[in-house]
Amino acid sequence: NRDVAACARFIDDFCDTLTPNIYRPRDNGQRCYAVNGHRCDFTVFNTNNGGNPIRASTPNCKTVLRTAANRCPTGGRGKINPNAPFLFAIDPNDGDCSTNF
């Protein structure tokens, strides 16, 4: 099913792997995890419109995604606070992580 609970187990790996990267303004990082014939899409997005490239906070990533997973059974997104530059998202979906051409 597309329940976010099946995706929550990947939060630490996603945040530990993608937040150390440097993101230009309006740039993002994504990762897909396969689970039980479905997929879990995760995103980190630098919402700044200008400025220097920056790194996301690993603890903020984990806090936001855990909060979304606990409050939103079909997935969600958010920031640690309204002025924070990074948006984090967790999105369970049907299908697998492969791309069909």
From Swiss-Prot:
<keyword id="KW-0930">Antiviral protein</keyword>
<dbReference type="InterPro" id="IPR054443">
    <property type="entry name" value="Y3-like_dom"/>
</dbReference>
<dbReference type="GO" id="GO:0050688">
    <property type="term" value="P:regulation of defense response to virus"/>
</dbReference>
<dbReference type="Pfam" id="PF22803">
    <property type="entry name" value="GBD_Y3"/>
</dbReference>
<protein>
    <recommendedName>
        <fullName>Antiviral protein CAP</fullName>
    </recommendedName>
</protein>
<comment type="function">
    <text>Has antiviral activity against tobacco mosaic virus and antitumor activity.</text>
</comment>
